[in-house]
From Swiss-Prot:
PROSITE patterns in the cross-refs: KRAB (PS50805), ZINC_FINGER_C2H2_1 (PS00028), ZINC_FINGER_C2H2_2 (PS50157)
The gene coding this protein: ZNF486
Family: Belongs to the krueppel C2H2-type zinc-finger protein family.
Species the sequence originates in: Homo sapiens (Human)
Taxonomic lineage: Eukaryota, Metazoa, Chordata, Craniata, Vertebrata
CDD domains for the chain: KRAB_A-box (cd07765)
Protein name per its UniProtKB record: Zinc finger protein 486
Length: 463
């Protein structure tokens, strides 16, 4: 270790040094899937620091994310750490400690004490998580604070996190000298930094320059690409002690644990239904208002949730980036893949207290429970017909609109539901997947099989 470094005060790397914060405007530009992505990245970063023995106490942001609370509901300075960070943390060199434990580099920070004591707020001023974070308000004294322009890099063993100090020195200097940079105006939004402006423009233009070499999926931020790449790895370090299920993300693991505890603290004032998470309750409330603000430009179909719209769009593109390791079947979303994987494991963690029947999905259990209550909460505004499930109402509405969004590529015939299209396709392939257990006769359609079964029980088939 260099001689002068020994005389300087040392301090361990903290979570705030690897945390990413969005402004209120940037946060509102993200859909639910992207917000969940942010949550996973933050929880992964925290896990890495805990693994290295760098973090002892849990930051408020992590507690917030684990409980499903949106981070912007907290005060700015409370999100990353308590007490608020002082400017000296932005004027530091990073040096690897000489002793290496378990092949990981433990990082220590050199802190410059001359930099002042102002409490500062965070602002994400970079395009990627690989750049260091910047603060908003500065003060004079840069020459006392920054003693070198040399670029220092910190690398964390297996999980590589790189921070470039030099890349942000000019921005940091601007804040100390109080020189105002050129303001970029785009519609009704203003930006102090060209990089923030550039990132925002990518959202507006739809530009996605960061492409995954594995599956071809593109992103408008390199950090989103980095997080996406995890979906292609098979590593699942989080294991549930209750049922043995493993997870890639700590957030997914935390979510899963609530299945066993049965905790549902978020209750709908309208109908009394309880939920595990606040964002699930928010989504549920739209059922009562009937609002569907998210519209598909391809077919004009509307949705009450942005994530549902994102999944729907893949019907038009045919994109299926999530593949099952067991059977090779591909899916349009990771959540559908997770549900599919339960077919191979046979896991059915959701059990009905009324009759004991078990299900692979919580939504299936919820739908099943309505059988016992006889409740039909979903009512058609056109004709008044009521349905047990929202999916039933959604399909029924198409009888009024005449909409048939599912089209056969082979012959052009269109259908109101994807299941009808799937069954239709068997007429082209000659496949007859529905087989009678009594006599072995096979059918293209499940409805034809049901009609046939009546022959064996002595009923006349319906015409």
């Amino acid at each position: 270790m260099p001689g002068p470094l020994r005389s300087l005060e040392m301090e361990s790397l903290q979570f705030r040094d690897v945390a990413v914060e969005f402004s209120l405007e940037e946060w509102h530009c993200l859909d639910t899937a992207q917000q969940n992505l942010y949550r996973d990245v933050m929880l992964e970063n925290y896990r890495h620091l805990v693994f290295l023995g760098i973090i002892v106490s849990k930051p408020d942001l992590i507690t917030c994310l684990e409980q499903g609370i949106k981070p912007l509901t907290m005060k700015r300075h409370e999100m990353i750490a308590k007490p608020p960070v002082v400017c000296s943390h932005f004027a530091q060199d990073l040096w690897p400690e000489q002793s290496i434990k378990d092949s990981y580099q433990k990082v220590i920070l050199r802190k410059f004490e001359k930099c002042g004591h102002g409490n500062l707020h965070f602002k994400k001023g970079c395009e990627s998580v690989d750049e260091c974070k910047l603060h908003k308000r500065g003060y004079n004294g840069l020459n006392q604070c920054l003693t070198t322009t040399q670029s220092k890099i910190f690398q964390c063993g297996k999980y590589v996190k790189v921070f470039h100090q030099f890349s942000n020195s000019k921005r940091h200097k601007r804040r100390h000298t109080e020189k105002k940079p050129l303001k970029y105006i785009e519609g009704d939004k203003a930006f102090n930094q060209s990089s923030t402006h550039t990132t925002h423009k990518k959202i507006d233009t739809g530009e996605k320059p960061y492409k995954c070499e594995e599956c071809g999926k593109a992103f408008n931020r390199s950090s989103h690409l980095t997080t996406h790449k995890i979906t292609h790895t098979r590593e699942k370090p989080y294991k549930c002690e209750e049922c043995g299920k493993v997870f890639k993300y700590f957030s997914s693991f935390t979510t899963h644990k609530k299945i066993h505890s049965g905790e549902k603290p978020y209750i709908c004032e309208e109908c009394g239904k309880a939920f595990m998470y606040p964002y699930t309750l928010t989504t549920h409330k739209i059922i009562h208002t009937g609002e569907q603000p998210y519209k598909c430009k391809e077919c004009d179909k509307a949705f009450n949730h942005p994530a549902t719209l994102s999944s729907h769009k893949k019907i038009h593109t045919g994109e299926k980036p999530y593949t099952c390791d067991k059977c090779g079947k591909a899916f349009i979303s990771s959540s559908i893949l997770s549900k599919h994987e339960k077919i191979h494991t046979g896991e059915k963690p959701y059990k009905c207290e009324e009759c004991g029947k078990a299900f692979t999905r919580s939504s299936h259990l919820t739908m099943h429970k309505i059988i016992h209550t006889g409740e039909k909460p979903y009512k058609c505004e056109e004709c008044g017909k009521a349905f047990t499930w929202s999916a039933g109402l959604h399909k029924h509405r198409r009888t009024h609109t005449g909409e048939k969004p599912y089209k056969c590529e082979e012959c052009g015939k269109a259908y109101t539901t994807s299941s009808n299209l799937t069954e239709h396709k068997t007429t082209h392939t000659g496949e007859k997947p529905y087989k009678c257990k009594e006599c072995g006769k096979a059918f293209n359609w499940s409805s034809d099989l049901n009609k046939h079964k009546r022959i064996h029980i002595g009923q006349k088939p319906r015409t």
